Structures are given as structure tokens and as C-alpha cells.
Regions:
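Conserved N-terminal catalytic core of the sugar/cofactor nucleotidyltransferase
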Residues: 33-98, 178
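A recurrent flexible, glycine/aromatic-enriched loop bordering the glycosyltransferase active site
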Residues: 149-159
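Conserved beta-loop-beta/alpha segment of the NTase-like Rossmann-fold superfamily
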Residues: 73-75, 81-144, 160
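Targeting/processing segments of secretory and organellar proteins
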Residues: 290-292, 296-299
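Short aromatic/basic micro-patch
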Residues: 25, 110, 150, 164, ...
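N-terminal glycine-rich phosphate-binding loop and ensuing alpha1 helix
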Residues: 1-58
């Protein structure tokens, strides 16, 4: 059984006056609802637990789960003081017998079933996997406003969610982190510190995390472009193409489309005695008429 924990307990301070980012409405629908839709439709996910602030539980149950018909939602639970605590609360609320879990940020609404499948497949090897993309920009180490080093970009990947783990492995990682008073930046870091090899599944640059007001117009644009369909098409290029951020597959598709000849309708023969709509009947010369047979088989003299 595969369960998903959708983490949306953050206060969204960087979102400013817009309020908690996971509940901001785009085209009349909360961001968290777009995210849940993907997991609701995915045949890979059996059930979900949503983690939100305590004072938002009833609103989420009524205005999100009930309004949008989320049948896979098993529970809506409150989050903790940190993301790590929130994930732990979500893990405890999953159905008994859950063997694998997918952790996902509620504010990454441009996730796709393809990414969920990819991270689940990658986690089969060691019990742990994340989605990530290669760094595109040069990364600097800075101290007190001064560059103290330049990182090798070829070795750097930007971690995303969804992340997938064997349930018992992730519970063990979280339990040990609490005992050791360790605060991890993501679930993979907790798995790493107990010696787990965490695999990487190629993510998507479109799988953005909505953290500030500047991200909202970007999501609105993606929404207008039907980004989920385009994302599924793009990531289906496979790890090599996606790792390069390669869009040549789309370009080739457009070229094939341009080269494709338009369908020609076959010309219909006009019936006897009727001319084509765009043509006047041709006047036949008397010599042509002599001895000719009309289409109706009557001989003319």
C-alpha cells in the first residue's frame, strides 16, 4: 500500500499579505487543491494524509476535501512547529499496513503522475529516493557579503518533492533525528544520516515551489498553458533528456507537425447533368458530340 503525506502546515510568511501560501486561490481554487488533484487521480497512490495548521483543519475538510471530492483523503491532521514535526504527524496518521510513502509539498502544484511514478521506481532500489534537477546557475559560497568559494555546478542538484521512502525506514530516520535533536532540511537528509543510500529521480524545472508573491503569476501562466499535459510530455523524454533540461523532443514534434501534408479531400465526380459548383458546364463541340456516348449510356447522333 502506498500512502502520500501532503505537507501544507507552513505559515507562508514570505507570501506576505496574500496569507498562507497553500490556501491562496488561483482561478478561484486553492493551491493545495491543485496539488491534491494530482494525487487523487494517480493510480499509484492508495490514500493521502494532509498536514495543515491546526486552525485550518475544518476549512480544509469542508472547502477543499469535500468541495473537490477528494475520495483518497484518509485524514487531515495538524502540523508541528517545524516541517519535520509536521511530516512525523502525517506518517503517524497513515493507514495501518502502509509499506511505501510519498512526501510532497502542498505548494508544489505542478507535480505530475509521471514524477510520482519515477520517484517510486527509483526508491525500489534502496528504499529512498528524491526528485531533483541539475543546478543551472553557478553557485557561490558567501560569507559576510564576500565570495569565499565557487561550487562545481556539475556536482550540484536541486532537491524537490515528491520524495519516496519505505515507510519503516523513514519512521526510523525521523525517530532517530528526534532522539538526537537533529533538524533536517528535508526527509532525505534524515535518511542519509542513518546510512541510507538515497537515489535520485530526475525531476522537472517546472515543478516550482510557491514561496513568494512573485511565484503566483508564474503558476497562473502555467495553468493557462495546461502545464500538466506539457510536463508529462516533457519528462517522458527520460532521464538523459530531462537532466539536460532538453526540449528537443518538443521541437522535433513541432517540425514533424510542420512537415505533415494537409489532408486533401478527394474530388467528387459530378453526377450526370450536374456541373461542379465552381464550374460552368463546358460547351462541347458538335464534332465531339457525334458518335459520343453520354454517361447515361444513350447514343447521340
Amino acid at each position: 500500500m502506498v500512502g502520500a503525506v501532503i505537507v501544507g502546515a507552513g505559515e507562508g510568511k514570505r507570501m506576505g499579505a496574500s496569507g498562507r501560501k497553500q490556501f491562496v486561490k488561483i482561478a478561484g481554487k486553492p493551491i493545495i487543491a491543485y496539488t491534491l488533484d494530482v494525487f487523487e487521480r494517480s493510480p499509484l497512490i492508495d490514500h493521502m494524509v494532509i498536514v495543515v495548521p491546526l486552525d485550518s483543519i475544518d476549512w480544509v475538510k469542508e472547502d477543499v476535501v469535500a468541495t473537490y471530492g477528494m475520495k483518497k483523503v484518509h485524514a487531515v491532521v495538524y502540523g508541528g512547529a517545524t516541517r519535520q514535526e509536521s511530516v512525523m504527524n502525517g506518517l503517524k496518521a497513515l493507514k495501518p499496513g502502509t509499506q511505501r510513502v510519498v512526501i510532497h509539498d502542498a505548494v508544489r502544484p505542478i507535480v505530475s503522475d509521471t514524477l510520482i511514478r519515477r520517484v517510486l521506481d527509483a526508491a525500489q532500489k534502496t528504499g529512498a529516493a528524491i526528485t531533483a534537477v541539475p543546478a543551472r546557475d553557478t553557485v557561490k559560497r558567501v560569507e559576510s557579503g564576500e565570495i569565499v568559494g565557487t561550487m562545481d555546478r556539475r556536482l550540484l542538484w536541486l532537491a524537490q518533492t515528491p520524495q519516496s521512502f519505505r515507510y519503516d525506514l523513514l519512521m526510523n530516520a525521523h525517530t532517530k533525528a528526534v532522539a538526537d535533536k537533529i533538524e533536517g532540511t528535508d526527509d532525505a537528509s534524515l535518511a542519509e544520516r542513518i546510512g541510507t543510500k538515497v537515489m535520485v529521480a530526475v525531476g522537472s524545472y517546472s515543478n516550482i515551489k510557491m514561496t513568494s508573491p512573485e511565484d503566483l503569476p508564474m503558476f497562473e501562466y502555467f495553468l493557462g498553458q495546461d502545464v500538466k499535459a506539457r510536463l508529462d510530455s516533457a519528462v517522458d523524454q527520460g532521464p538523459r533528456g530531462a537532466a539536460r533540461g532538453d526540449t528537443r523532443g518538443e521541437a522535433r514534434g513541432r517540425q514533424r507537425h510542420r512537415r505533415r501534408r494537409p489532408h486533401r479531400r478527394s474530388a467528387r465526380k459530378p453526377e450526370a447533368g450536374h456541373a461542379r459548383p465552381s464550374e460552368a458546364p463546358r460547351q462541347r463541340h458538335p464534332k465531339e458530340m457525334k458518335g459520343a456516348h453520354h454517361r447515361d449510356g444513350v447514343r447521340h447522333s
